[in-house]
Amino acid sequence: GLFPSLGSTTAGSLLSGLWLQDVLMLAVLACFLAARKTSWRMIGVRAPQGRHPYLGAVIGGILLYVLMTLLVQLINALLPNGLSAQNVQSYMQADDALWVKIFVVLTMGVFVPIAEELIFRGYLFNSLCRYLTPQMAMLFTAVIFGCAHMDAQRAIPLAVGGYLLNVIAVRYQSVFASAIAHGLWNAVMIVAYYSVL
């Protein structure tokens, strides 16, 4: 694997898979941008603009966590057998070494959100804006984001979260703002999950 020091643990497999997937997605994105002669800045890779953008991104991340928790609890209550564990949760349960937990939080709270924001709120959203109104592009991007996680039970909450991340990216004219919110959402979720294990 990419992280031989993790051994053959399921956490190591998860992290290797996530890093490989995201590195490949970013490589494909870089090729698309080069082929279209589009700069990274054109897809939102720039400092957040507007009033208090970093504070807004942090507040957005906290609100995302609260809203997603409520939506997941609602869905959990409506399903006869409740929600099944996410793959990430299953992997996190398999290895309880502190350094693995820290690495999972960093991976899910930093690397994955940056990659996903560049793909969804950066490239996809801006590409759809060529053919759709910004509101429709936000909606389509959110639905694709929800479906891309390959979790039918959580697709709606993830789409809602994706829409709110679009709002943050558009509001602050930067995928860095939405990456901060996304990273905080993921990190708080993982830390909260670890705290109840």
Where are these regions (language model features)?
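Transmembrane alpha-helix boundary and packing residues in multipass membrane permease domains
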Residues: 30, 73, 122, 126, ...
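Juxtamembrane helix-loop-helix connectors linking adjacent transmembrane helices
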Residues: 1-18, 37-112, 130
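Hydrophobic core segments of transmembrane alpha-helices in multi-pass, intramembrane catalytic enzymes
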Residues: 21-25, 104-108, 158-165
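Active-site His/Glu-centered metal-binding helix of metallohydrolases
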Residues: 114-119, 123-124, 151, 184, ...
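Selective recognition of hydrophobic, aromatic-rich stretches within alpha-helical transmembrane segments
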Residues: 12-31
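Functionally important transmembrane alpha-helices
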Residues: 135-197
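Structural signal for the C-terminal ends of transmembrane alpha-helices
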Residues: 31-40, 168-172
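Membrane-interface helix/loop boundary segments of multi-pass membrane proteins
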Residues: 51, 115-140, 170-174
